[in-house]
Each structure stands twice: as structure tokens, then as C-alpha cells.
Amino acid sequence: MRTDVFLQRRKRRDVLLSIIALLLLIFAIVHLVFCAGLSFQGSSSARVRRDLENASECVQPQSSEFPEGFFTVQERKDGGILIYFMIIFYMLLSVSIVCDEYFLPSLEVISERLGLSQDVAGATFMAAGSSAPELVTAFLGVFVTKGDIGVSTIMGSAVYNLLCICAACGLLSSAVGRLSCWPLFRDCVAYAISVAAVIAIISDNRVYWYDGACLLLVYGVYVAVLCFDLRISEYVMQRFSPCCWCLKPRDRDSGEQQPLVGWSDDSSLRVQRRSRNDSGIFQDDSGYSHLSLSLHGLNEISDEHKSVFSMPDHDLKRILWVLSLPVSTLLFVSVPDCRRPFWKNFYMLTFLMSAVWISAFTYVLVWMVTIVGETLGIPDTVMGMTLLAAGTSIPDTVASVMVAREGKSDMAMSNIVGSNVFDMLCLGLPWFIQTVFVDVGSPVEVNSSGLVFMSCTLLLSIIFLFLAVHINGWKLDWKLGLVCLACYILFATLSILYELGIIGNNPIRSCSD
């Protein structure tokens, strides 16, 4: 048991370090593109565009959306910024601990009790929990800051969710994952409809009560489709499988079948194979006294689960254990561990409390990253495309990579696309509450400048992702990861050139300039 826990912690550490390295690579490339764009903007051929800067509408800097730091600018430049870097690392570690120790196990128990397949679980509960920071951001934007921070944050990180997280899953997975056509098609269509609805709603810079109700209705229809996903998928496969090879059922020996391990009363280990087309991959079978398909692998939920206060044997692991002990203790006393038999019936409370802590840690993470970017003079354009987008989506990134590394590719992809669909609810719910219960009859004012480019990019990225998966043979591997990474770098390059006014003739400047 101790060896399993150490291996699990090592996997979490490897995933976290790999994600950080990938984000630093993206940040370096995007920053180089920005510097090159500034050089071109200063040339004689681009000076005419700079004359339009005074007439263009300014945007608030990212730092205006958060409280001031606990150091002055000069104190941060004199060395105080190291404290912020340590807080950033600790928040990343905290998010990974919540996801690994509480959030994903609660998702496992929920899926087991409700009989959900991998893709449905990833598109609903996993997407809702990992997108909790966006929901908090949307409520802050409507009720606290009275601005469009929710729109800018959700729309700005949407392309990152689609392309960058998919790239991370493909590049950091140890094995090739097989993808199913129907779940990806279902989620991509739902997200395309959601994006089109948001663009139509905010085109006049005002959101009324029926606009928020429309978004809630779209998400309600999406959830209803998920509830009847088995029947719908069977109909689609029977209707279109003769003309579409990707919808044809795979052989029973393929990787689509998940091994379910159960321990009977005589403690003998038995293995049963069940296709994804069955009613659920987590349902109990007669003759099994204990059944678990762990999101971290085929792990038994033991009565003697490893305590967070047990010290590791090696010195390096002891250092990491001491560093993570405060947050581990905080989570231990505030979140019930549904892996333990006593708390297993409180899995929904575990899920909700995990989402709360994920939101809190992510907010502090993005706050610290924003201050670091402001101190180092990193432009908001580069920050928004890399570190801030990654910060708000770090729960999705960690959760998706973890389940992808265990061979659950459909769950990872459904979480990637499904979390973006849930983000539409993040916009519709606070808008509906504001216009119906708070300021009755008064619309919510939003700023839709520049969203035409963003909306076109979102729709194109959805189409590109689906086509890339199809061309790659419905495999989640390093080739798909490289293609998605290159596409995201291209998107970031075009976005930077657009905001600088090099393309589009519409430079965007900060109000602090």
C-alpha cells in the first residue's frame, strides 16, 4: 500500500512538472512573437497604425481585476517577487493535490453510483468541478466588478482549453489513447451552438433576462442529451455507421473495453471486460463485494488508506511532504475523503468542497501570476494568451492529463470540450440572476469589442480539433499533441498581431498607458 501511494505521488509530481515545462515553452514562444510584433509595429510601414491608437478604445489592465499585492512595485523588484513565485508553485501543488486526492475520487464514486460512461462523466461532473473558477469569475464580473471580466476570461481561455490541454494530453500521455467519434462530435456541436448563442447575445453590448435564459436552456438541452446519451448514440451508430467508418463498433479486444476489477467475498481477483456501449462502466455486478475502477489506475479502495500524516522514507520526499503538509492538513479536515468507507456516502459533499478549494486556489494563482507579469513588465497580451489562460484552466489541465495518462481518452476529451460548454452556463446563470432578481428590467452592459475575431477563432478551432482527430485515426497521441500545440501558437501569434494593430487595423491599448 505504501508503494502504491508513493507511485501515485510521483505520477502527480511528474504531471505537474511536465505541465509547467510545457507552459513555459508556450510562454517563451508567444513572448518572442510579441517582441517581433513590437519591432514591426515601430517600423515606418506600421506607423500609420499607431496614429489610430489614440482613437481606439482602451481596455483595463489585467491587474485591475484583482486586489493590490502585499508588496509595492519597488519592493517586488528588490526581491519580493520571489515570494510570489513561491506562492504560484504552492498553488499549483495545492490544485494538483485537490484534483488527485479528492476531486477525481469523488468523480469516480459519482460515476459508479449513477452508472455514467467515461465521456458523460467527463462532460458533466468533471467539467463542472474543474470549471468552478470560471463560474466564480463570471459571478465576480457581474455582481462585484460590474464589468465584462467574465466574458473576457471565459472567451479568452476557451481556445487554450481546446488546443493547449489537448496538446498536453497527447504529449504527456505514456500510451496512445483511442477516441470515440460520437462523444467528440456531440460535445463539439454543443459547444459550437453555445459559442454562436453567446456571440448573438452580446452583439449589441447588452444582455437581457431572456438572453441569460436562452443560455441556460442551451445547457439544459445539452444535459438532457447526455441523460439519453446511450439511446442516442446507439441510434446514431446504427443509422450512420454504414457510411462513416469512425462510428463502427471496434473489436472486443481493442482498447475501448475497460477492465473492471472486483474483489469477491473470498478475496479472489476476477477480471471482467465490458464494452463502453453497456449501460455504464462503473455499475456493480452481482457476486462482487467491492468494485472500483480508479481514475488513477486499477486501485483498491482499501480500509487502511494511507494517512496524510505518514512521513515518507526518502529525504527528498520528506521535503515535499513537509511543504505540502499545511494544505494536506487543511484539506483533510475540511473535505471528506470518499475513498474511506466511512465517508463514501458523502461523495457529493467531497465533490462540492473540492470544487470550492479548486476555485480558491486558482483565484490566488491567477492573482499572483498577474502581479508577477505586471512587475516583470510582461504585456497583458502575452499574459492573457499564456499564463493567465493556463492559470484559470489549471484544474482542467491537471485533471485531463491525469485521466489521459491512465488510458481514459474519452473522459479527457469530453472534459476539455464539456468544460467549455459549462462555461456558457457560467455566463448565463449570473446574467439571468442579475436581470431577474437584482436589477429587474435593467440589462447587463458588456463590451463586445474584438469578440468577432475571437468568435471566429473559437469556431475554427472546434472544426480544426474534430478534423485533426479524424485525420489522426481517432488516436490521442504525441502527433495530435504537436499539431494542437502548433495551432495554438499560430492562434496566439494572430491574436497578438491583431491586438497590436498589425493586422485588422484596430490596435488595442491599455487604459494605464
Swiss-Prot record:
> Which phenotype arises from disrupting this gene?
Fishes show a delayed and reduced development of pigmentation. They display a diminished number, size and density of melanosomes.
Q: How does it sit in the membrane?
A: Multi-pass membrane protein
Keyword terms, alphabetized: Antiport, Calcium, Calcium transport, Golgi apparatus, Ion transport, Membrane, Potassium, Potassium transport, Sensory transduction, Signal, Sodium, Sodium transport, Symport, Transmembrane, Transmembrane helix, Transport
Write out the topological domains of type Cytoplasmic. Answer: 100-123, 170-181, 229-315, 372-381, 442-450, 504-513
Catalytic activity reported: Ca(2+)(out) + K(+)(out) + 4 Na(+)(in) = Ca(2+)(in) + K(+)(in) + 4 Na(+)(out)
What tissue specificity is annotated for this entry? Answer: Highly expressed in melanin-producing cells. Colocalizes with melanin biosynthesis marker dct.
- Superkingdom classification of source: Eukaryota
Similarity-based family: Belongs to the Ca(2+):cation antiporter (CaCA) (TC 2.A.19) family. SLC24A subfamily.
Record localization? Golgi apparatus, trans-Golgi network membrane; Melanosome
Which segments cross the bilayer? 79-99, 124-144, 149-169, 182-202, 208-228, 316-336, 351-371, 382-402, 421-441, 451-471, 483-503
Q: Report the record's Gene Ontology biological process terms.
A: calcium ion transmembrane transport; developmental pigmentation; intracellular calcium ion homeostasis; melanocyte differentiation; melanocyte migration; pigmentation
| Naturally occurring in which organism (per UniProt) | Danio rerio
Is Secreted given among the entry's keywords? no
Q: State the signal peptide span.
A: 1-35
The name of this protein is Sodium/potassium/calcium exchanger 5
* GO MF annotation: an example: symporter activity
State the Gene3D superfamilies in the record. NCX, central ion-binding region
Function in brief = Calcium, potassium:sodium antiporter that transports 1 Ca(2+) and 1 K(+) to the melanosome in exchange for 4 cytoplasmic Na(+). Involved in pigmentation, possibly by participating in ion transport in melanosomes. Predominant sodium-calcium exchanger in melanocytes.
Extracellular side of the membrane: what ranges?
Answer: 36-78, 145-148, 203-207, 337-350, 403-420, 472-482
What GO CC annotations are associated with the protein? melanosome; membrane; trans-Golgi network
